[in-house]
Curated annotation (Swiss-Prot):
Gene expressing this chain: ung
NCBIfam families xrefs: PRK05254.1-1, PRK05254.1-2, PRK05254.1-4, PRK05254.1-5, ung
GO CC field: cytoplasm
Recorded superkingdom: Bacteria
Protein name, UniProt field: Uracil-DNA glycosylase
Organism, as annotated: Bacillus anthracis
Biological process annotations from GO: base-excision repair, AP site formation via deaminated base removal
Length: 225
């Protein structure tokens, strides 16, 4: 599962692929992919980093582990492949977006448009066994994605971290650089969205911060496919 990242993440993360934890993770993943159905496809594991380079990252939306149903996961947190029903948490994200900006809820959950504008859609665990949420938790991915967060924390140019729910908020300890901004609320999951996600206006908060920095704002509207 070693991967040559084709943008500026490549040299930054190359040392991770040589560390003992990643070698053990690599052995585990080869076994998992050869004996079980695992998501996403091998070639999609690092899509978040491929779509959103280090220098171009303006915003990070932190997720947990990939969707574990057929044809859903493709390497971006919260996003699903075209032609797949929009999952409940993402539907709530769209409802909040509609309330903030008046955008219609799209007919898909394909968030590549966000990634291409500098929104790093990063899960803390990058693979999962079909039908078994958190099945690859504690196997090494957390070390790797913590390093991604640490590298962004080291950047002088500000990054806006969106932390929804306790799992994402546990990563706050890695964000120590005062240049960066944190936006947080409960998770958009149907279990918690009404306890403070709805009405939290994360998308317009991001764009206000970007505008104040003289940076281009994110066009959050996802087109129909």
């Amino acid at each position: 599962m070693k991967h040559v990242l084709k943008n500026d993440w490549g040299p930054l993360l190359a040392p991770e692929f040589e560390k003992e934890y990643y070698r053990e993770l690599d052995v585990f993943l080869k076994e998992e992919y050869s004996t079980h159905v695992v998501y996403p496809k091998i070639e999609d594991i690092f899509n978040a980093l491929e779509y959103t380079s280090y220098e171009n990252t303006k915003v990070v939306i932190l997720g947990q582990d990939p969707y574990h149903g057929p044809n859903q996961a493709h390497g971006l947190s919260f996003s699903v492949q075209p032609g797949v029903k929009t999952p409940p948490s993402l539907l709530n994200m769209y409802k909040e977006l509609r309330d903030e900006y008046g955008y219609d809820i799209p007919n898909n959950g394909y968030l590549v448009k966000w990634a291409e504008q500098g929104v790093l859609l990063l899960n803390t665990v990058l693979t999962v066994r079909q039908g078994e949420a958190n099945s690859h938790k504690g196997k090494g991915w957390e070390h790797f994605t913590d390093r991604v967060i640490e590298l962004l924390n080291e950047r002088e140019k500000p990054v806006i971290f969106i932390l929804w729910g306790r799992h994402a908020q546990a990563k706050k300890k890695l964000i120590t650089n005062p240049n960066h901004q944190i936006i947080e609320s409960v998770h958009p999951s149907p279990l918690s969205a009404r306890r403070g996600f709805f009405g939290s206006k994360p998308y317009s908060k991001v764009n206000t911060i970007l505008a104040n920095m003289g940076e281009g704002e994110i066009d959050w509207e996802i087109p129909n496919l």
